[in-house]
């Protein structure tokens, strides 16, 4: 029973932490989402003042092994990683100094508060609509022209079956990278599913290993 109570309180703390940080950052978020050219400043805020405090505040210690450093060098990259936890978003921010734009499912735009800013800065895709997928290509090219990187989880979502370690990849990320002639930077999140799965009564604090 104490273990289940811990998991319940720990999950509640996650949502409190995410929401509290957004509320505290509201003035900056409203300001920096007002103009597209301010995205780099917004990215710094999200990386250092939102994602990093969430990771450490939840008791996670990211350990990154780098074969390739994604530096803030005004070059564009296609960042791809396995998708297995809500923590993947925070981990991706933590791993990349280079500002990127997420390509993500439109359903997240319906979330209170978070969804408002998500709509303003991310490239939204309706996975059931071929027209929406075409629009993703054009929007991604615009952001690459702005010298920003693109981040896509090529599995297209988190598999419902938790026994699946890596689901089949959609080809969108690779098509965009080839067409725009930008390097693909693969990342592997080893521990996110174990540390913070989508199931409520599971997970643990500890190291989160990442290969870049």
Describe each PLM feature range.
Residues 22, 26-45, 55-57, 72-130:
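Catalytic core of membrane glycerolipid acyltransferases/transacylases, capturing the structured
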Residues 83-85, 155-159:
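Short glycine-rich anion-binding loops that position phosphate/pyrophosphate groups of nucleotides
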Residues 76-78, 149-153:
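Residue-level preference for the first positions of well-ordered beta-strands
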Residues 58-65, 133-134, 192-195:
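Short gly/ser/thr-rich secondary-structure transition/capping motifs
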Residues 64, 79, 102, 210-212:
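Generic preference for hydrophobic
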Residues 134-140:
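Anionic-ligand binding region
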Residues 113-116, 148-151, 160-212:
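A cross-family acyltransferase "interaction/gating" segment
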Residues 1-33, 69-72:
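Membrane-interfacial terminal anchoring regions of lipid-handling membrane enzymes
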């Amino acid at each position: 029973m104490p273990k289940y109570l811990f998991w319940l309180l720990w999950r509640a703390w996650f949502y409190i932490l995410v929401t509290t940080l957004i509320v505290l950052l509201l003035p900056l978020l409203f300001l920096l989402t007002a103009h597209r050219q301010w995205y780099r400043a917004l990215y710094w805020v999200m990386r250092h003042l939102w994602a990093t405090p969430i990771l450490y505040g939840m008791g996670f210690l990211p350990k990154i092994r780098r074969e390739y450093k994604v530096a803030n060098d005004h070059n564009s990259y296609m960042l791809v990683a396995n998708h297995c936890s809500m923590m993947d978003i925070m981990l991706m921010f933590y791993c990349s100094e280079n500002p990127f734009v997420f390509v993500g499912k439109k359903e997240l735009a319906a979330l209170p508060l978070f969804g408002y800013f998500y709509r303003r800065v991310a490239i939204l895709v309706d996975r059931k609509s071929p027209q929406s997928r075409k629009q993703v290509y054009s929007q991604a090219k615009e952001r690459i022209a702005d010298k920003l990187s693109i981040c896509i989880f090529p599995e297209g979502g988190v598999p419902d079956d938790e026994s699946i370690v890596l689901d089949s990849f959609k080809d969108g990320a690779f098509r965009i990278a080839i067409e725009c002639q930008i390097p693909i930077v693969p990342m592997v999140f080893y521990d996110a599913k174990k540390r913070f799965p989508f199931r409520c009564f599971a997970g643990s604090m500890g190291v989160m290993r990442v290969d870049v």
